[in-house]
Curated annotation (Swiss-Prot):
Classification via NCBIfam families: PRK04863.1
GO terms under cellular component: cytoplasm; nucleoid
UniProt similarity note: Belongs to the SMC family. MukB subfamily.
Organism the protein comes from: Escherichia coli O6:H1 (strain CFT073 / ATCC 700928 / UPEC)
Lineage of origin: Bacteria, Pseudomonadati, Pseudomonadota, Gammaproteobacteria, Enterobacterales
GO MF entries: ATP binding; DNA binding
Compartment list: Cytoplasm, Nucleoid
Name of the protein in question: Chromosome partition protein MukB
Length: 1486
């Protein structure tokens, strides 16, 4: 019998009132008695703290705080301690008689939070003689002691031999040791377990029915059934793992795709950049060489352009100098042309004005004669009109006087007076003082004759004056002509000058006639002179271009030489063109061939890569397509053999899997129908009863029962008979054995044991001999052993099957690779290397390019010589026709001579043109200049005097006529005579008056008409004079302007001036054109020089940069190559087919791969950082580092147990094979792992039945418990209706819900939860997931409802609730429940700890005064029956009869508080006995 462990003592060190106190604990009940505040609760608190040192759970509330949700701030612990180090220790002895001291070191933490620091520890191997107080205290003197800190305690214990001290950093480790050593009943793995344990202790401490426990009775009482649960969990874990593995395989397949994608993109990213750098390095080297060649060529071109620039600049300076002279000459010629044109226009105006003046002169002379005649007639009309007027006046006067005389008597006297007046007037006018009326008639005749004589004399003088006036006019005309030609001179010199001018005019006219021939001659000579100058210029230009001076005689020979050179150069150029065409044609053919080879090279390289991969994979060398096809046939044969062997291993593996599955059935049943029959018959499988048989006994029992080892044990065979009728769903042989499954033994058979065999006497006449099986399968241990061996065999078979599958798939993939190679690359794989041919063609192309370059240089020189020769011949062709002009040295002198003669002729022509008309006019009248008509003025005066005399004579004749006419008046002597005479006179006067008035009117009309006509004549004369004077002035101005112009205006002058101007303009234009050409050429040359200079600088800069870049890149490239070779990735990166792509294509390829890689490594921080660093274009080695990092990353993810290679590419290929094999294997495994819903229902039902039986056993132990009116206590266990329905559906109607259990998307737990929801739609599942609900449904405890019932008085069995019971009854019932929980925990934990350990049992009860004596006695009885220790606290009036009682009294002495303790042990039948350690504890150390 295993002894139960016991708590020996409780030690409090430095607690409030207890400095160093050890309470020895009774084996059953220890009672703490004392008044209020005596320290009972403090003692219990120290015990609980040492038992559960978890500050998150500890809460020591006062009784008055019962039901409160919060207590004091320190939860009752801080105030129970003293300052300094405190201890609470439990001294125990377990079933192995091992003394174990467990405890805690407590210490108050300074601060307002009133915290406590707890350190748990344990002491093993302590001698029984050593008391706990001796360990933790050090005696200073008789009255003082000191508490040791934990480190000193550790040192002290380590110094003791055989003593082990353990300090724990976690409560879990502390409780784990206490469980292993049998101090606590249950393993407290988690905070939840600790909380349950604390709630149990707390419930016992404060008494009553704890709602926290009764609500969770299933968690406290029912074991977790970890085996079944673990089976379910293992099954689900296996399924989950299987599915996760399948999902992982799918993920891995996607990872494989990712890996392939990562390797592909990384290879593209790095290889493209690697090959681009390789290409760029080659290109940079070529560019550096090209830059160097271009630099040399540019320097030569710049030197040539500089020489050319100097020549053109010199020629431009010459043309600029010549242009100034030509511009001056052209401007002078233009001005001369303008002057000639102006002179011609002036000459035309002069001639026009001279013609107009001649015409005006004639008209003016004619008009002068008309005006003179008109003046004479006007004077005559005026005289006639005046005479008629005088006569009329006279007659009127006479008639008036006569009328007056007739009116008055004095009329005669008046007439007489008038006659006397007329006589006196006549005397006065005629100067005849002796004139009388009688002599008047005689004198009238005299004076009339005198008048006639005066008139005749006047007419004669008038005729003479007209003639003199004409002579005077011719002389003035001739004189004016001489003055106009020669200038002012004396009148007497006019004759001589006129004759000289006429002779000079003849000479000038002769010279003027030579102007046109001289002009033509001069024009011809000037043209020849210009041609001579042009020929000299061409010769000078030719000599300058040829760089040598030539004589005129050498030009013809030079012309022939140049023509011969042109012919030879033309042939050379033609031959060079044909040779160049041949070279270029060959070059194009080479280029075309290289292009075709470059297009074929990537295909050939891809074929070679594929061929090399095939060679590496199969380890064969292929030299022809026939080798490939032959090896493919061998590969097919090998594949068939591997498939046959794989199928054989697979069949054996399936057989092993089936056997493992059969042996893995719960209860050892190999037939699922037996489980259903056992449940139906209410029995138990025999294999399940003997499930715990050891491996050593398994062969015996297997042979003992023989074929009946699969029998069903039933309580009563008679009750099974009715079930056997019509039974068909069962094995062929069904064995039924009657017996109690709870106490079944093998006594039903008579057995004789032999060597490795048994003889079973079934009946008197029937024995059975059975040998011990070599591989027993009876009992769980035997099955597990067999399953283990089968698993080992299965592992070997699986590994072999995996190897064969891998080989088959590898062979198949190799076959596919060969098929792809034959379909894609076989046609080109064994052709010649295009790259070698490309290299040969490139070398030939370089030779052709060099030959073409040399040929171009030679051809360029020949072309330059040809062009120079052509230019020379062209220039000579223009010069040779003018050789005679170049030899004529006197041409310029002749031109000057003719020009002088032409100037003289032109001067004469101008003289003739200017004075020719005057000389022509002067010539016929020159003779009038011999005598000067100076008497013209005297004649003019005589004529005027004659006119006056004629006028006076007329007046005298008129006066005498009047006297004669009034002669009658003188005879009036008296009035009679006057009257008689007056009548006749009146008539006569009137007649004469009428005649005189008529004459006067006629005279007036004639005078008026002649006056108007004279006025018109005068106006015409004035107009003509004005026009003549104006034109004369204009003519003089024009002649002066013509003289000022100083140009001879003739008919050919304008033409010559225009020709000269046009020639100069043509020369100027040619010069300007040439100058513009030179300027443009010079500008172009300068631009070309600038471009060449910039190009030269750029080429120098580019060359040095490129050279530096090449040098720098060489170092970087060496580092890259070293890194590539060190890491062995050159084969992956040096992809020759990429060498045929352009840099842009490679960069695009690299950039696309970079974008894909950024997405691919987004979740990998290391690769992401390395990729980001590799993006630096200046550090190509970082891309290699990234590639190496990718390979390393993939290598780390290669399972070396599956894939035996370091190459990720090969690993991916092997991974594809392995993943496909694993997918098949795991799919079949999932089908085998899946458990049926009927099996689940059977397992849960059996577990429920077993636990119901266990609860019934526990109830038997509580039947005799009574407290007050409570006669008995029991636990009632029922299956929930909803869960019972679920079990029925799982076992009977599971086919209807296969959509849940056959779903690959749902685990079994999730399918179970979905089914539960489907069956109970009215139940709200809350926020719980189907997985959580399913896991709860797999726990049988959730199928049960548990409640505590009490048999109380007359009420019978009713539910145990605090409201229905008294305080004592509730405390007793609660204590009974706690005892049941503790017992259940022990049963549950028995298989977890050693078989030789029975754990301690201890509960608490504070304030036990609420129980009566009968109830306390019941507690004592319960503790005795269950071997349980109990610590109760009660007031002083409680005196238990059994156990140990401590009386506690708190005292204060000299401001020091301590508890006085007295211990008593059992006083009823025995004498009181003072327990050890009951003396007062020493005072605290000062």
């Amino acid at each position: 019998m295993i002894e139960r462990g016991k708590f020996r003592s409780l030690t409090l060190i430095n607690w409030n009132g207890f400095f160093a106190r050890t309470f020895d604990l009774d084996e059953l009940v220890t009672t703490l008695s004392g008044g209020n505040g005596a320290g009972k609760s403090t003692t219990m608190a120290a015990f609980v703290t040492a038992l559960i040192p978890d500050l998150t759970l500890l809460h020591f509330r006062n009784t008055t705080e019962a039901g409160a949700t919060s207590g004091s701030r320190d939860k009752g612990l801080h105030g129970k301690l003293k300052a300094g180090v405190c201890y609470s220790m439990l001294d125990t002895i377990n079933s192995r008689h091992q003394r174990v001291v467990v405890g805690v070191r407590l210490q108050q933490v300074a601060g307002r939070d009133r915290k406590v620091d707890i350190k748990p520890f344990a002491i093993q191997g302590l001698p029984m003689s050593v008391q706990p107080t001796q360990l933790v205290t050090e005696t200073l003197n008789e009255r003082q002691a000191r508490v040791l800190p934990l480190n000193e305690l550790k040192d002290k214990l380590e110094a003791m031999e055989g003593v082990q001290f353990k300090q724990f950093n976690s409560i879990t480790d502390y409780h784990s040791l206490m469980f292993e050593l049998g101090i606590i009943a249950r393993r407290l793995r988690s905070a939840s377990d600790r909380s349950k344990f604390y709630r149990l202790i707390e419930a016992s401490l404060y008494g009553g029915i704890s709602s926290a426990i009764t609500r969770s009775l299933r968690d406290y009482l029912l074991p977790e059934n970890s085996g079944v649960r673990k089976a379910f969990q293992d099954m689900e874990a296996a399924l989950r793992e299987n599915r996760m593995t399948l999902e992982a395989i799918r993920v891995t397949q996607s990872d494989r795709d990712l890996f392939k994608h990562l390797i592909s993109e990384a290879t593209n990213y790095v290889a493209a950049d690697y090959m681009r750098h390789a290409n760029e390095r080659r290109v940079h080297l070529d560019k550096a060489l090209e830059f160097r060649r271009e630099l040399h060529t540019s320097r030569q071109q710049l030197a040539a352009e500089q020489y050319k620039h100097v020549d053109m600049a010199r020629e431009l300076a010459e043309h600029n100098g010549a242009e100034g002279d030509l511009e001056a000459d052209y401007q002078a010629a233009s001005d001369h042309l303008n002057l000639v044109q102006t002179a011609l226009r002036q000459q035309e105006k002069i001639e026009r004005y001279e013609a107009d003046l001649d015409e005006l002169q004639i008209r003016l002379e004619e008009q002068n004669e008309v005006v003179a005649e008109a003046i004479e007639r006007q004077e005559e009309n005026e005289a006639r009109a005046e005479a008629a007027e005088l006569e009329v006046d006279e007659l009127k006067s006479q008639l008036a006087d006569y009328q007056q005389a007739l009116d008055v008597q004095q009329t005669r006297a008046i007439q007489y007076n008038q006659a006397i007046a007329a006589l006196n007037r006549a005397k006065e006018l005629c100067h005849l003082p002796d004139l009388t009326a009688d002599s008047a008639a005689e004198w009238l005749e005299t004076f009339q004759a005198k008048e006639l004589e005066a008139t005749e004399k006047m007419l004669s003088l008038e005729q003479k004056m007209s003639m003199a006036q004409t002579a005077h006019s011719q002389f003035e005309q001739a004189y004016q002509l001489v003055v106009a030609i020669n200038g002012p001179l004396a009148r007497n010199e006019a004759w001589d000058v006129a004759r000289e001018l006429l002779r000079e005019g003849v000479d000038q006219r002769h010279l003027a006639e030579q102007v046109q021939p001289l002009r033509m001659r001069l024009s011809e000579l000037e043209q020849r002179l210009r041609e001579q100058q042009e020929a000299e210029r061409l010769l000078a230009d030719f000599c300058k271009r040829q760089g040598k001076n030539f004589d005129i005689d050498e030009l013809e020979a030079l012309h022939q030489e140049l023509e011969a050179r042109i012919a030879s150069l033309s042939d050379s150029v033609s031959n060079a063109r044909e040779e160049r065409m041949a070279l270029r044609q060959e070059q194009e053919q080479l280029q075309s061939r290289i292009q075709s080879l470059m297009q074929r090279a990537p295909v050939w390289l891809a074929a070679q890569n594929s061929l090399n991969q095939l060679s590496e994979q199969c380890g064969e060398e292929f030299t022809s397509s026939q080798d490939v096809t032959e090896f493919l046939q061998q590969l097919l044969e090998r594949e068939r053999e591997a498939i046959v062997e794989r199928d054989e291993v697979g069949a054996r593996k399936n057989a092993v899997d089936e056997e493992i599955e059969r042996l893995s059935q719960p209860g050892g049943s190999e037939d699922q129908r037996l489980n259903a029959l056992a449940e139906r018959f209410g029995g138990v499988l025999l294999s399940e009863i003997y499930d715990d048989v050891s491996l050593e006994d398994a062969p015996y029992f297997s042979a003992l029962y023989g074929p009946s080892r699969h029998a069903i044990v039933v309580p009563d065979l008679s009750q099974v008979t009715e079930h056997l009728e019509g039974l068909t769903d069962c094995p062929e042989d069904l064995y039924l054995i009657e017996g109690d499954p709870q106490s079944f033994d093998d006594s039903v058979f008579s057995v004789d044991e032999l060597e490795k065999a048994v003889v079973v006497k079934i009946a008197d006449r029937q024995w059975r001999y059975s040998r011990f099986p070599e591989v027993p399968l009876f009992g769980r241990a035997a099955r597990e052993s067999r399953i283990e061996s089968l698993h080992a065999e299965r592992e070997v078979l699986s590994e072999r099957f995996a190897t064969l599958s891998f080989d088959v798939q590898k062979t198949q993939r190799l076959h596919q690779a060969f098929s792809r190679f034959i379909g894609s690359h076989l046609a080109v794989a064994f052709e010649s290397d295009p790259e070698a041919e490309i290299r040969q063609l490139n070398s030939r192309r370089v030779e052709l390019e060099r030959a073409l370059s040399n040929h171009e240089n030679d051809n360029q020189q020949q072309r330059i010589q040809f062009e120079q020769a052509k230019e020379g011949v062209t220039a000579l062709n223009r010069i040779l026709p003018r050789l005679n002009l170049l030899a004529d040295d006197s041409l310029a002198d002749r031109v000057d001579e003719i020009r002088e003669r032409l100037d003289e002729a032109q001067e004469a022509a101008r003289f003739v043109q200017q004075f020719g008309n005057q000389l022509a006019k002067l010539e016929p009248i020159v003779s009038v200049l011999q005598s000067d008509p100076e008497q013209f003025e005297q004649l003019k005066e005589d004529y005027a005097y004659s006119q006056q005399m004629q006028r006076d004579a007329r007046q005298q004749a008129f006066a005498l006529t009047e006297v004669v006419q009034r002669r009658a008046h003188f005879s009036y002597s008296d009035s009679a005579e006057m009257l008689s005479g007056n009548s006749d006179l009146n008539e006569k006067l009137r007649e004469r008056l009428e005649q005189a008035e008529a004459e006067r009117t006629r005279a007036r009309e004639a005078l008026r008409g002649h006056a108007a006509q004279l006025n018109q004549y005068n106006q015409v004369l004035a107009s003509l004079k004005s026009s003549y004077d104006t034109k004369k002035e204009l003519l003089n101005d024009l002649q002066r302007e013509l003289q000022d112009i100083g140009v001879r205006a003739d008919s050919g002058a304008e033409e010559r001036a225009r020709i000269r101007r046009d020639e100069l303009h043509a020369q100027l234009s040619n010069n300007r054109s040439r100058r513009n050409q030179l300027e443009k050429a010079l500008t172009f040359c300068e631009a070309e020089m600038d471009n060449l200079t910039r190009k030269l600088r750029k080429l120098e800069r580019d060359y040095f940069e490129m050279r530096e870049q090449v040098v720098t890149a060489k170092a970087g490239w060496c580092a890259v190559m070293r890194m590539v070779k060190d890491n062995g990735v050159e084969r992956r990166l040096h992809r020759r087919e990429l060498a045929y792509l352009s840099a842009d294509d490679l960069r695009s390829m690299s950039d696309k791969a970079l974008g894909a890689l950024r997405l691919a490594v987004a979740d990998n921080e290391h690769l992401r950082d390395v990729l980001r660093m590799s993006e630096d274009p200046k550090r190509p080695e970082r891309k290699i580092q990234f590639f190496v990092a990718v390979y390393q990353h993939l290598r780390e993810r290669i399972r070396q147990d599956i894939i035996r290679t370091d190459d990720p590419v090969e690993a991916i290929e092997q991974m594809e094979i392995e993943l496909s094999r694993l997918t098949e294997e795991l799919t079949s495994r999932e089908q085998k792992l899946a458990i049926s819903s009927r099996s689940v229902a059977n397992i849960i039902r059996k577990t429920i039945q077993r636990e119901q039986n266990r609860i019934r056993m526990l109830n038997q132990g509580l039947q005799n418990v009574s407290f007050g009116q409570v006669n008995s206590v029991r636990l009632n266990v029922n299956v929930r209706e909803t869960h019972a329905m679920l079990l029925d559906v799982l076992s009977e109607q599971h086919e209807q819900h296969q959509d849940l259990f056959n779903s690959n998307r749902l685990t079994f737990s999730e399918a179970l939860a979905k089914l539960y929801q489907r069956l109970n739609p009215q139940i709200d599942m809350g926020q719980r997931t189907p997985q959580t609900i399913g896991e709860e449904l797999l726990d049988y405890r959730n199928y049960l409802e548990m409640e505590v019932e009490v048999n109380r008085g007359s009420d019978g069995w009713l539910r145990a609730e605090s409201g229905a019971l008294s305080t004592g009854e509730a405390i007793g019932t609660g204590m009974s429940i706690l005892v049941m929980v503790v017992q259940s925990w022990e049963d549950e934990s028995r298989r977890l700890r050693g078989k030789d350990i029975s754990p301690c049992r201890l509960l608490f009860l504070d304030e036990a005064a609420r129980l009566d004596a009968r109830s306390i006695a019941t507690l004592f009885e319960l503790c005795e029956r269950l071997q349980m220790q109990l610590i109760i606290a009660a007031p002083e009036n409680i005196s238990p009869e059994k156990g140990t009682t401590y009386k506690l009294v708190r005292k204060v002495f000299q401001n020091t508080e301590h508890v006085h303790v007295v211990g008593l042990r059992g006083f009823a039948p025995q004498l009181p006995e003072t327990l050890p350690g009951s003396d007062e504890a020493p005072s605290q150390a000062s």
